[in-house]
A protein has these predicted regions:
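Non-heme di-metal
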Residues: 1-224
Length: 224
């Protein structure tokens, strides 16, 4: 992605103050998303590692691929933040690292429904986050970021639907949805052998397990 230009108000923009506000909101959302992707990736790593039984090998493989895409999104968001002259918030990095490790560990001791429901709910929140980022990018004149945001939104949407498909008929879903609010969206096309993810997966992730910068997996130093 190209460095963020200094823009003047265009047809979809307001005053210069409005543009500055939308740029600030765009950055704020992406800072939250950057750390949120860390929590998601670490939680998914614990999740797929907990699925050691042979009859869950297909689910295990897909969650492993989804983890890889979360790391990819984190790298892409990090690039945008750098181009905007910003970066991650250390306190949020520490918090989300802890959240990801905690929920990843819970997958080894809890049942099957809970982690899948939580993953779908998380992916739904990610969809909304990237959609809102796109709104602010457009209003701030940062249209060159829209294609990347659209791709990440579509990928997160596919993740949400894939997780939702797994629990759509589970007897606990109606009660859980009433209590926690998230209900799976309509299912993906079941004729797609890869659950609808293949046409959105970056080429460098095809056929690969989850890959992350080793530095990203280490607990962030809150003093830095």
């Amino acid at each position: 992605m190209a460095p963020a230009p200094v823009t003047s108000a265009g047809p979809d923009q307001g005053t210069s103050d409005d543009v500055a506000l939308h740029r600030a909101l765009f950055v704020a959302i992406l800072r939250a998303a950057y750390s949120g992707e860390l929590a998601a990736a670490l939680a998914y790593r614990g999740h797929w590692r907990s699925l050691w039984r042979a009859h869950r090998s297909d689910v295990r493989a897909e969650i492993r691929r989804i983890e890889a895409e979360e790391w990819h999104h984190r790298r892409e968001v990090g690039k945008v933040l750098a181009e905007m002259g910003s970066g991650p918030q250390r306190w949020r990095e520490v918090a989300m690292w802890s959240v990801g490790r905690f929920f990843g560990s819970l997958c080894f001791v809890g049942g099957w429904f809970g982690p899948i429901y939580a993953a779908g709910r998380l992916e739904g929140a990610n969809v909304g986050q990237y959609e809102q980022a796109a709104v602010h990018a457009r209003r701030a004149g940062l249209d060159h970021y829209l294609p990347g945001l659209a791709l990440m939104t579509a990928t997160e949407d596919r993740h949400e639907r894939w997780f939702g498909n797994l629990i759509a008929q589970h007897p606990l879903l109606p009660l859980t949805s009433r209590l926690l609010g998230w209900r799976p969206p309509p299912p993906l096309d079941e004729t797609d052998p890869e659950g609808g993810l293949s046409d959105r997966r970056p080429d460098d992730l095809d056929g690969a397990g989850a890959t992350a910068d080793p530095a990203e997996e280490q607990r962030p130093d809150p003093s830095r």
